[in-house]
Amino acid sequence: MNITASKEDYLKAILHLKEKNGYVRATDVAEVLSVKKPSVSIAFGKLAADDLITVHENHQVDLTKAGYDIAAKINHSYETVKQFLCSIGVPEKVAEHDACRVEHYLSQESVVSIGGLVGELSLIHISEPTRH
C-alpha cells in the first residue's frame, strides 16, 4: 500500500472532523482541504480500497484501525514540529503552514528528537529569570 502525502492529509482531516463533529462527510473534508467534492470522492475510493476508511450507506466516513494509526502518527508529527517552530519564535500561522509541509517526510526518530528538544526549550523558558 502506497501512503502518499495527499492520503495522509485526507486521513488527518477525517480524524480532526470526527473529533470535532462526531461525524465526517465528504463536503466537510472538501471544505477543510480546500478541494472540490469530486476530488474527495476519488480520494475516499482510494482510501477505502486501501482499507483505511469505511464509507457508510449514509455517506459518512470512519477511519479503520489502520487509518486511525496513520492519521494519529501524522497529527503527532505535525503538532511536534509546530510546537518546535513556535518555541523558536516562528509566528503561529507560519509554523502551522511549515509543519503541514514537513510532517509527511520526518522519520519517527526525528519526531521523537524534536519533541525532546521542545521539552528542553520549554524548561529553559520556564526557568529563565524575569528581566526588568
Where are the language model's segments positioned?
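Glycine-centered, phosphate/nucleic-acid-interacting loop/turn motifs that mediate DNA/RNA or nucleotide
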Residues: 51
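N-terminal helix-turn-helix DNA-binding core of bacterial DNA-binding proteins
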Residues: 2-35
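Conserved small/polar residues in nucleotide/adenosyl-binding loops
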Residues: 124-132
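Amphipathic alpha-helical dimerization/coiled-coil segments
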Residues: 79-119
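Append "Primarily bacterial transcriptional regulators
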Residues: 29-30, 47, 95
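Basic amphipathic alpha-helical segments that dock to polyanions
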Residues: 40-48
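Basic, amphipathic "hinge/linker" alpha-helix immediately C-terminal to the N-terminal HTH DNA-binding motif
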Residues: 59-77
